[in-house]
Design a protein with these regions (language model features):
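Extracellular beta-strand elements of beta-rich domains used
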Residues: 111, 161, 174, 193-200, ...
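Contiguous beta-strand segments within globular domains
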Residues: 103-110, 213-237
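Extracellular ligand-binding interfaces
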Residues: 77, 81-168
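Extracellular carbohydrate recognition
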Residues: 182-201, 760-761
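Short carbohydrate-recognition loop motifs
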Residues: 59-89
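Extracellular carbohydrate-recognition regions
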Residues: 1-62, 308, 700
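Glycan-recognition and catalytic cores of secretory/periplasmic carbohydrate-active enzymes
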Residues: 3-17, 23-24, 205-207, 213-214, ...
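Aromatic sugar-binding surface patches on proteins
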Residues: 154-160, 259-272
Length: 774
C-alpha cells in the first residue's frame, strides 16, 4: 500500500539506512504453515553425526528447542590465510549419516538452528542431500542438491526445504556446512551453532516447474498497472466469469475468462482506468490488493534504491556492515596500486564489477531524469546514489586506459594493508568497459552541471578520455580475458555506438556522430534482414555475433540485447536528417517485427530467448566456477537443450530460455529484450511494443506460473534469496527463474542457491531502468 510505503520511507530516511523486510508477505510464511502429511525423525547424536573441517562438536542438553538436546558446533569464522578463490577461508560440515536409503517417500527436510554470532547479521550455511544412486547429489560442478540458509543471530530458526525434484534413491547423508567469511564488524572470530529437531517430511509440494499455474493462485502483476496499460491476469481454470472489486468491495468490472494455451484462462480488465486499489476474483480465488495508477511502480523503484544503498562497499551500512574492503587494491602493470573500496557489492558475494556498476549508474540517471517532475524526492535520491557509483568509476581509473575492472571477493577483510588477507587485482585496459563508462559519464554531465560544475567537469574529462582509450584498444586480442570479459563484434560495436552518441549529445561534436554512424553500419551488417524460407516461423531482424553471420547472438547470464537497438534509436533521434537515418529506422522496424512475432509464441506473453543452431556454439565465453572437469558444458548437452526449443527447421530452434550450464537464471536476458522493446516503443512511438516490454516486467513481478514476485519485499510470496553476506535485502531482483537439466520450461524450486536465486545489481538495475522508461 502507498501508505505503508510512505512509512517505510520515513523510517529509513528515504533509504539512507536499510529498509525493514515484511516476513508475513514472504513465501516462507506459507511454507511453514503447510500441513505435514508424514514425517520421520532423524535423531542427532554421536553415533550418526560426524564433523568435517575446523571446529568442535558436542552434545548440548540445555540449549534445545525439542527438549531432547541439540548438537553444538563451535566454529571459527577466520583462517590463517585466504583461499586462492577469494571465497571462504574454511568450511565446517556436520554430516548426519544415512545407510544408503531411498528417501523418495519424503519431499521436505525440517530442522531448527540457533546461532550465537553478535557481529554477523546473516550466518551463511548450506544444507545438502548426498545421493550416491543413479544420479549423484550434490551435482558435481553445478548448484543442484544444496539449499543455502541465512540464519540471524540470537533466535531459533525453523528451516524447511522442499526437494521433490532432487534425486534421493540412495542417500548416504544430509549435511549442514558453515562457511568462514570473517565478520562484517570487528569482533572475535568464532560463532556457536545449535542444531535440533531434524526430520524428514512429506507435504503437498509447491509448483516448481512448467507453465501451468500454481494451484489456487492468480497470476497478476503484484505492483499493479498503469491506467493506460493493457491489464491482464491469469487463472489455471475458470467458470468463465471474473470480477474486479475496488477498495470498498464493489464490483467495478466483470468479464469473461478467455482460454489460452496450457489450460490457462486470461482475464482482461484493460477498460478500467480509474486510479485506486483493486482485487480480482474468479472461481472462489481472490488476489491480494493491487494498484491501478500512474504511481503503480514507484514503490518498486524506491525499493531498488534501497537494495543499492544496502550493497554499498567501503561504507558503514547500518545493520549490515561497517566500512569494508579498504585493503582491496587494484594494481597497474607498472606496479602502482590504488584502493578500490566503494561502489557497490555486485551480487550475493562481495565482488565488484565496473561494467555492472556503470549500468547501475546509468539506470539511476534515467530514473532521476524520468521522475524529476512527478517524484522529485525519488529523483533526488536516485541522483545521490548514482553519484556514489560515478565517484567510484572515476576514482578507480588510472587515466591511461587502465582501470579497476573488478575482482571476486567472498569474505570480510581486516581493512589493514600488508596482512595475509589482502587482495591485489590486476587493472585492465578493456575497451568495452571504457566505452560503457565513457557513455555513463557523458550522460551524467547535464544532471550535475548546475549543482556541482566541478564534478560535472570531472565527468566530462573522464568521458572524453575513456572514449579515446577504448577506440585505441577496441581491436586488441581478447584471448587472455576471462570468459565473462570477451565480447563479440556486435557487442563491442553496439556499446561503442551508444557511447559515441552519449558524447555527441553531451558535447555536440560531430566527430562523435561520425563514429556512431560507422559503428552502426557494422551493426546493420550483423542483422538478419531476410527470412529463412525454411523457418516454420518467418523470423528476421535478430542479430548475429559478427558481420560474417557465423553464429546468432544469444545471451545466458549478463545480457546486452538492447544495445544495438538503443544505438539505432539514439542515432535516429539525434540525427534524423542523416543519410543513414532511413536505414536505422529500417533496422528498428526489422527488430520490431521479430519482437512482435516471438511475443506470441509463449504463454503469458513471455519473450523467448533466441535462436540456436545445432553444433554451433563457443564454450570459451561460458563462465564456469571451479574445475571445468566437474560439470563443464559439452556439445552433447548443448544440442540436447537446443532440440527442446521450438523447431524452426532441421538445424535451428527458438529457445524460450537460454542454453545454459552452471550459471542459470534468466531475468537478465529477459530484461535485455524488454529494454530493447522499450527503446523500440520510444523510437517508433509504438504502444503495442511498449506493452510487450511491460509484460516482461509483469512476469517478474507476479504474472508467472509460480504466482510470485521476484523482487524481494515487493508484492508477496517472494522467495528468500541467495545473499550469503547480508540479510535479505528489500528491492533485490535476483538472477531468478531457471530451467531443469536440458528442458525449456520455467523451473523455480524452493531450493535457494547460486546463481539463479542470487541477488545481483545487473538485474536490479535493469528493473529500475525499465521503470524509468515507462
Amino acid at each position: 500500500m502507498l501508505g505503508q510505503m510512505k512509512r517505510q520511507l520515513e523510517n529509513s530516511r528515504c533509504f539512507r539506512q536499510g529498509m525493514e523486510k515484511d516476513l508475513e508477505e514472504c513465501a516462507e510464511a506459507r511454507w511453514l504453515a503447510k500441513p505435514v502429511l508424514d514425517s520421520r525423525a532423524l535423531p542427532l547424536d554421536s553415533d550418526n553425526v560426524r564433523l568435517q573441517g575446523p571446529g568442535v562438536m558436542s552434545l548440548e542438553k540445555k540449549h534445545t528447542i525439542s527438549g531432547k538436546g541439540s548438537i553444538r558446533l563451535d566454529v571459527p569464522t577466520d583462517g590463517c590465510r585466504r583461499h586462492p578463490s577469494n571465497r571462504a577461508f574454511s568450511v565446517t560440515t556436520m554430516m548426519r549419516l544415512l545407510p544408503g536409503e531411498n528417501l523418495e517417500r519424503f519431499n521436505r527436510i525440517s530442522l531448527w538452528i540457533y546461532v550465537d554470532s553478535p557481529a554477523i547479521a546473516n550466518n551463511f550455511m548450506e544444507l545438502s542431500i548426498h545421493n550416491q544412486g543413479k544420479h549423484i547429489m550434490p551435482l558435481p560442478g553445478r548448484f543442484e542438491g544444496t539449499h543455502t540458509l541465512g540464519i540471524p543471530h540470537g533466535e531459533w530458526q525453523h528451516i524447511v526445504w522442499e526437494f521433490p525434484y532432487v534425486y534421493r534413491d540412495f542417500v548416504t547423508g544430509i549435511s549442514l556446512s558453515i562457511h568462514a567469511h570473517r565478520t562484517p564488524v570487528p569482533a572475535p572470530q568464532g560463532i556457536t551453532v545449535y542444531v535440533d529437531n531434524m526430520c524428514l517430511e512429506q507435504v503437498e509440494a509447491d509448483h516448481y516447474k512448467g507453465f501451468d499455474l500454481r494451484a489456487g493462485a492468480i497470476a497478476y502483476c503484484h505492483s499493479g498497472y498503469r491506467p493506460e496499460a493493457v491489464k491482464q491476469a491469469y487463472a489455471q481454470s475458470g467458470s468463465g466469469v471474473f470480477y474486479l472489486r475496488n477498495s470498498s468491495g464493489e464490483v467495478t468490472f466483470q468479464g469473461n475468462c478467455v482460454p489460452q494455451a496450457n489450460g490457462l484462462r486470461q482475464m482482461d480488465f484493460s477498460p478500467v482506468k480509474a486510479e485506486g486499489w483493486y482485487t480480482l476474483e474468479v472461481d472462489g480465488k481472490k488476489s491480494r490488493p493491487f494498484r491501478i495508477g500512474r504511481d503503480a511502480y514507484i514503490p518498486a523503484a524506491w525499493k531498488t534504491l534501497n537494495f543499492f544503498f544496502s550493497e554499498r562497499c567501503g561504507f558503514d551500512v547500518p545493520g549490515i556492515h561497517t566500512e569494508c574492503h579498504m585493503d582491496v587494491m587494484s594494481v597497474h602493470p607498472d606496479g602502482r596500486r590504488l584502493p578500490v573500496c566503494g561502489g557497490w557489492h555486485d551480487a550475493g558475494d562481495l565482488t565488484q564489477a565496473a561494467i555492472n556498476t556503470a549500468e547501475s549508474v546509468f539506470a539511476m540517471l534515467e530514473l532521476a531524469i524520468a521522475e524529476r517532475e512527478a517524484q522529485p524526492e525519488l529523483s533526488q535520491r536516485a541522483k545521490e546514489e548514482a553519484r556514489w557509483g560515478l565517484n567510484w568509476l572515476m576514482r578507480t581509473r588510472w587515466g591511461d586506459g587502465y582501470r579497476h575492472n573488478g575482482t571476486v571477493i567472498g569474505f570480510w577483510s581486516d581493512n589493514i594493508q600488508g596482512t595475509l588477507d589482502d587482495i591485489n587485482a590486476d587493472s585492465g585496459n578493456r575497451p568495452f568497459d571504457n566505452f560503457m563508462i565513457a557513455g555513463v559519464c557523458a550522460k551524467a554531465i547535464a544532471l550535475f552541471r548546475d549543482e556541482d560544475p566541478r564534478f560535472a567537469d570531472w565527468c566530462a574529462r573522464c568521458a572524453k578520455e575513456d572514449f579515446s582509450f577504448a577506440l585505441a584498444a577496441m581491436h586488441q586480442s581478447q584471448d587472455n580475458e576471462s570468459a565473462g570479459a570477451r565480447y563479440t563484434q556486435l557487442q563491442m560495436n553496439a556499446q561503442a555506438a551508444i557511447s559515441a552518441m552519449e558524447l555527441y549529445e553531451a558535447f555536440g561534436e560531430t566527430e562523435y556522430l561520425s563514429r556512431g554512424v560507422s559503428f552502426a553500419r557494422i551493426l546493420m551488417a550483423c542483422q538478419a534482414s531476410a527470412v529463412d524460407p525454411s523457418f516454420s516461423i518467418p523470423l528476421r531482424g535478430y542479430f548475429y555475433e559478427n558481420e560474417t553471420h557465423e553464429r546468432i547472438q544469444t545471451y545466458y547470464h549478463r545480457s546486452y540485447e538492447h544495445a544495438p537497438i538503443k544505438a539505432f534509436a539514439m542515432l535516429y533521434r539525434l540525427a534524423p536528417e542523416h543519410e543513414d537515418a532511413a536505414r536505422w529506422k529500417n533496422s528498428l522496424e526489422l527488430y520490431r517485427e521479430y519482437v512482435a512475432l516471438t511475443s506470441r509464441t509463449v504463454p503469458y506473453g513471455l519473450l523467448p530467448n533466441g535462436i540456436y543452431e545445432l553444433d554451433n556454439t563457443d564454450f570459451s565465453t561460458i563462465t564456469h566456477e571451479g574445475a571445468r572437469a566437474a560439470g563443464a558444458p559439452s556439445l552433447e548437452e548443448y544440442n540436447a537443450q537446443v532440440r527442446n526449443g521450438i523447431r524452426l527447421n532441421d538445424r535451428f530452434y527458438l529457445r524460450v530460455f537460454p542454453v545454459a550450464y552452471q550459471f542459470r537464471g534468466f531475468h537478465a536476458t529477459l530484461m535485455g529484450r524488454a529494454l530493447a522493446a522499450m527503446e523500440l516503443a520510444r523510437a517508433l512511438n509504438d504502444r503495442e511494443i511498449k506493452q510487450v516490454a511491460v509484460r516482461q516486467m509483469e512476469w517478474i513481478l507476479g504474472c508467472n506460473p509460480f504466482a510470485v514476485s521476484s523482487m524481494y519485499g515487493e508484492g508477496h510470496d517472494y522467495h528468500p534469496l541467495y545473499a550469503p553476506m547480508s540479510p535479505q535485502l528489500v528491492g533485490a531482483v535476483p538472477v531468478e527463474f531457471e530451467t531443469f537439466e536440458n528442458e525449456d520450461q520455467p523451473f523455480y524450486p524452493m531450493q535457494n542457491n547460486a546463481t539463479y536465486k542470487e541477488v545481483w545489481v545487473h538485474t536490479t538495475c535493469r528493473m529500475m531502468w525499465l521503470i524509468a522508461m515507462l
